[in-house]
């Protein structure tokens, strides 16, 4: 359907043999997202960055065969994930909310920190997401709630998936917007008349943050690194005058504490280290002592 209406998506294929999988990866390159034909909450999914990881994961997942096909998708690094939550009636969008993930795409939407309204999306990105969402709603003749997840990188927009149901972010965007999306969706499904919300309601002078609650400290040998498997056990929603204010409220709400003396910085590669310099200087001005793993090893 997406090909027919001219909407882009990451390259993917349902494959039934190791030969087919290798041929597909030769075409798109690593990294790739590997998953069984149907998964829930990211279970049994994995991002493979090289041949060794691919073979190890496929042995754990299942035997690849015509009875057990594996879907392999191109994984786009350093892309932003954007969500469209909407209610449509007879294929026409009645109300919508576009939110952005703070983490790069690759973190399960149930674990990701989400901000609404979006604060760092290009105007053209938002415009294209609206247009594609209208196309999909019309093509599927949607009447009710739906959620579309997008990849956005340099105004290049790709559809990850479309779910014809209310998503976990529906209550969050409803509360931030003060528009009950579920009430609208219920009226649509019952065939009752629905009025489109006034566009002025979408002009907010505050920011909402949805953050996830984790239980890593209570689970022995739990991996705290977030990925495509959902690991959170709850979530909070907070509102602030800007992103920083709302994020701070959210982090405190899920149990993080503001450090008193030192801050450990785990910064990754050289570019990420350079990107962290300004934040480290700000922490230093506030009286904190930034510490790196290199510094810890030296002492």
Stretches found by the model and what they are:
Residues 279-284:
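Surface-exposed amphipathic alpha-helices with a cationic face
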Residues 1-8, 14-17, 23, 27:
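Conserved N-proximal alpha/beta basic substrate-recognition cap immediately N-terminal to
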Residues 1, 5-6, 28-31, 40-42, ...:
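ATP-dependent carboxylate activation and anion-phosphoryl transfer catalytic cores
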């Amino acid at each position: 359907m997406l090909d027919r209406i001219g909407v882009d998506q990451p390259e993917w294929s349902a494959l039934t043999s190791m030969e087919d999988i290798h041929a597909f990866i030769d075409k798109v390159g690593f990294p790739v997202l590997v998953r069984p034909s149907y998964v829930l909450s990211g279970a049994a999914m994995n991002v493979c960055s090289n041949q060794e990881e691919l073979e190890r994961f496929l042995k754990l997942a299942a035997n690849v065969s015509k009875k057990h096909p594996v879907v392999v998708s191109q994984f786009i690094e350093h892309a932003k994930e954007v969500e469209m939550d909407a209610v449509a009636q007879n294929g026409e969008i009645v109300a919508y909310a576009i939110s952005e993930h703070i983490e790069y795409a690759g973190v399960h939407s149930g674990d990701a920190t989400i901000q609404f309204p979006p604060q760092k999306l290009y105007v053209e990105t938002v415009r294209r997401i609206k247009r594609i969402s209208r196309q999909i709603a019309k093509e599927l003749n949607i009447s009710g709630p739906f959620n579309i997840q997008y990849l956005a990188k340099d105004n290049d927009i790709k559809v990850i998936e479309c779910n014809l149901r209310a998503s976990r972010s529906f209550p969050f965007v409803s509360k931030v917007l003060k528009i009950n999306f579920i009430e609208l969706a219920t009226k649509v499904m019952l065939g009752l008349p629905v009025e489109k919300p006034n566009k002025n309601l979408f002009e907010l002078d505050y920011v909402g943050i949805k953050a996830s609650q984790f239980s890593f400290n209570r689970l022995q040998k739990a991996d705290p690194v977030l990925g495509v498997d959902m690991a959170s056990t709850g979530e909070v929603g907070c509102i602030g005058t800007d992103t920083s204010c709302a994020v701070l409220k959210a982090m405190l709400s899920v149990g993080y504490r503001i450090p008193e003396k030192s801050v450990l910085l785990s910064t990754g590669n050289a570019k990420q280290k350079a990107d962290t310099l300004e934040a480290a200087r700000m922490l230093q001005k506030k009286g904190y002592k930034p510490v790196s793993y290199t510094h810890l090893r030296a002492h």
